[in-house]
Curated annotation (Swiss-Prot):
Organism: Bartonella bacilliformis (strain ATCC 35685 / KC583 / Herrer 020/F12,63)
EC code: 6.3.4.21
Post-translational note: Transiently phosphorylated on a His residue during the reaction cycle. Phosphorylation strongly increases the affinity for substrates and increases the rate of nicotinate D-ribonucleotide production. Dephosphorylation regenerates the low-affinity form of the enzyme, leading to product release.
UniProt keyword list: Ligase, Phosphoprotein, Pyridine nucleotide biosynthesis
Reaction equation(s) it catalyzes: nicotinate + 5-phospho-alpha-D-ribose 1-diphosphate + ATP + H2O = nicotinate beta-D-ribonucleotide + ADP + phosphate + diphosphate
Similarity field: Belongs to the NAPRTase family.
InterPro entries: N/Namide_PRibTrfase, NAPRTase_N, Nic_PRibTrfase, Nic_PRibTrfase-Fam, Nicotinate_pribotase-like_C
GO BP term, pick one: NAD biosynthetic process via the salvage pathway
Protein name, UniProt field: Nicotinate phosphoribosyltransferase
Length: 424
């Protein structure tokens, strides 16, 4: 891979538009895995995805120029999958499986186009929605987040001169390498890049991936970013996300179907995937509710991704459940991916080492940690908690409860209904 002087590139903004998203493959791998299932099983479902800034103190509409945002969104609308990209998806091996993407799905992808967006402003925030068929609207999630995140980074650095930018990136690289030095001390650790959605920039994510590849070698198992996986000959990694049970639950017409919704998703998933792709995401409506109602066959799956409980607490609860089901945790896999920093990774690794197989999906703290790197304090280089989630399905409100109340999504009445329902 060619090395880019990131500071020079940031400073030399002499072009009309510097596209943030240059390929539809610049997304998380699980979006494509989910898309194949959505396209195959739920072609008639219409959804809305919405941008949600959890940190209301950060006024995105004041930080980011609306014209620049529209220009980036419009450019992304123009993107199509290239012939090279389709051939790579068809011919590559993912998770040890050949032809994981079926020919009819890839043929459909050849003409794929993102639906239009709806953008307005209110109280210093952008109101950004994507309406349409689930199989189309879903693919806006990652580009929307990367565009907002990188535009905010660019705005924060706009007034830095070339020397200040050199200092910023030199310090950020040194900071990143110090993390790698700590990770190298953990035998058999498995680290993956899960940092696409809230990255500082595409070029910075690429540098971080190169650094991990160089620094920890075989302990770096791959990246969730499909474009980077293709360009760097890394494994593309990812399983499934909360949007699946959120939509399926929203479509239900009775209590029995609502209770079964999280497991219906798993049954749908197993029609398409196997092996290490059989990873359970249990926390959409609370992990306790999921485990309490889970059919016996769920324990046969390869592993779990505890995504919103504290890692040690969440992992221990799943290990306890496996033991209750007569399974050996040492043969199972836990994927930790929520708000990881090196301290958390070290503590979690030492706690579970030898008890269970582990992979760490390292996200925002990998690809957007610029705290104290600038020559002067720049508040807008701090990361904001930004998500783009499904908010309705066929006109019905979608809900996510999570194990962390701060991550709850949905209108208050539906949230309360789900809380009451899944609490017993």
């Amino acid at each position: 891979m060619n090395h880019t002087d990131i500071a020079k590139r940031v400073y030399n903004h002499t072009w009309k538009l510097d596209p943030i998203v240059r390929s539809l493959l610049d997304t998380d791998f699980y979006k494509l895995l989910m898309l194949q299932m959505i396209w195959g099983l739920y072609p008639d479902v219409h959804v809305t995805f919405s941008l949600i800034n959890r940190n209301k103190a950060i006024h995105l509409a004041d930080d980011i120029d609306e014209g620049e945002l529209r220009a980036q969104l419009d450019h992304t609308l123009s993107l199509r999958f290239t012939k090279k990209e389709i051939i790579w998806l068809a011919g590559n091996t993912f998770y040890g499986q050949k032809q994981i993407f079926k020919p009819d799905f890839l043929h459909w992808l050849e003409n794929f186009q993102l639906p239009d967006y709806e953008l307005s402003r209110k109280d210093g925030q952008y109101i950004l929605h994507f309406h349409g068929s689930w199989a189309y609207s879903s693919m806006w999630e990652i580009p929307a987040l990367t565009i907002i995140s990188e535009l905010r980074s660019r705005a924060a650095m706009k007034n830095l001169d070339r020397f200040a930018l050199d200092v910023l990136y030199a310090r950020a690289k040194a900071k990143m390498w110090s993390k790698i030095e700590r990770l190298k001390k953990l035998p058999d650790i498995k680290i993956s890049d899960f940092g696409t959605r809230r990255r500082h920039s595409f070029l910075w994510q690429r540098w971080c991936v190169e650094a991990l590849k160089e620094g920890i070698g075989a302990s770096f198992t791959g990246t969730s970013n499909v474009l980077l996986a293709m360009d760097t000959d890394l494994e593309a990694l990812g399983t499934n996300a909360h949007e699946l049970p959120m939509v399926i639950a929203a479509l239900t017409n009775n209590d029995d179907d609502l209770r079964k919704a999280p497991y219906q998703v798993l049954q749908d998933w197993k029609r398409y995937y196997e092996g290490n792709l059989l990873i359970v995401l249990p926390d959409t409506f609370g992990t306790e509710a999921f485990l309490r109602n889970a059919p016996k066959w769920v324990a046969d799956w390869t592993g779990f991704r505890p995504d919103s409980a504290p890692p040690i607490e969440g992992g221990e609860r799943i290990i306890q459940w496996w033991q209750e089901q007569g399974k050996k945790p040492q043969e199972k896999l836990l994927i930790f991916s929520d708000a990881l920093d090196v301290d958390t990774i070290e503590k979690t690794y030492h706690h579970f080492h030898g008890k269970v197989r582990m992979i760490f999906g390292w996200g925002t703290n990998l690809t957007n940690d610029f705290a104290n790197c600038a020559p002067q304090e720049i508040a807008d280089l701090d990361v904001t908690s930004l998500v783009c989630k499904v908010t309705s399905a066929n006109g019905r409100p979608a809900v996510k409860l999570s194990d962390n109340p701060e991550k709850t999504i949905g209108n208050p009445q539906e949230i309360q209904r789900y809380l009451n329902f899944f609490s017993h």
